[in-house]
Amino acid sequence: MKNLYKILASSIAIFAFCACSQEEMPVNQSDNNQSEVVTRSATGIKNIVYIEVNDINPLNAGSYIMDDAPFFDYVILFAANIRGVGSDATLYNNPNVQYILDHKDTLIKPLQDKGIKVLLGLLGDHTGLGFANMNSAQTEQFATAVANAVSQYGLDGVDFDDEWAEYGRNGYPSGSTGSFSNLITALHNKMPNKTITAFNYGYAYELTNVNSYINYGIYAYFNSASWSTGFGMPNSKWAPYTINLNSAPSASSAQLYATQVANKGFGAIGYYDLRANNIVSVLNGVAKGAFKSTCTYDGNSYPKNY
C-alpha cells in the first residue's frame, strides 16, 4: 500500500486526469429518493482501518468513539506477507507483526473487547510469488497457514492487498493463473465464519467469481471516491472512499464524500495509516456525513512499545 501511495504522489497529474473520468464529486445534498440517515445502525456502514504496525500501536484505533461504540469496526494489522521459498508458499510475519500476535492479550484482545474485529493484513514480499501465481499445492499450503494463524491468534479474519509480489521473479510464473480466486475459496472453506476483505489492487479484479466469499472490497485510491464497485461487489459490500489518515483531507471534504457514501447505499469506508496523534477532526467529518453523528477522541495515545 505504501507502494501505491508513492505511485500516486509521483504521478499526480496522471491521477488527476483519471480521477476526472472515474470520480463523481460529492455534493452537499441528499438524493431526493433517499431517506434521511439518522443513526449509525440505519446505514450499516463499516469503518475499516489499515494500521502500519511497524510504526503504530494498533490500540490507537480504540481511542475514537461514536454513538457510545468504537468508531472503527475493523482494524487490519498491516501486514504479514506471502513469501515464496523454493517450491513453498509461506506465511511470513516480520518481528513487529509477530510480537503483536504473540502478545495478543495486550495488543489485540483490548480492541476485540470493545467490539472491533481485528484482521491480519496479507501482502506480497518481493519474492516473485504472490496470491495470483500459485499452483494448486501452493494455494492449499498458504491457505492452511493463514487459517491456522487466524485460529492460533484469535483473529477475526484477513485482508488481501496484492502489492509487492513482483510476479515472475526467481523463476516463479507471471500473475493471473487463477490462484487468487482459488485461494479465497480455499480460505473461506477453512474458516467460513471469519471475515475476508480485499483491497482493489493488482489482480483483485479476478475475484469476481468468488466475491460472495468476500465481506468487503476497498477502493484503492486515497482521498477520492469512485461510485463503481470492483470485482463485481454489490454496493452494500464496497468501500468507495478511502482516506489516507497520514495525509488526510479536510473535515468538510470528508463529510461531503461520506454523505454520498451513505446516500448511495455503500457498505463501508476505508482508512489507511492511522497515526498515534489525534485525528478526530476528519473522523468527525465522516461521522457527520455518513452517520449524522459525532466522533470523539478519548485522549488515549498509545506509543509503539514493541
Residue ranges and their predicted role:
Residues 20-306:
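Secreted glycan hydrolases and related glycan-binding modules that recognize and/or cleave
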Residues 1-32:
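Bacterial Sec-dependent N-terminal signal peptides
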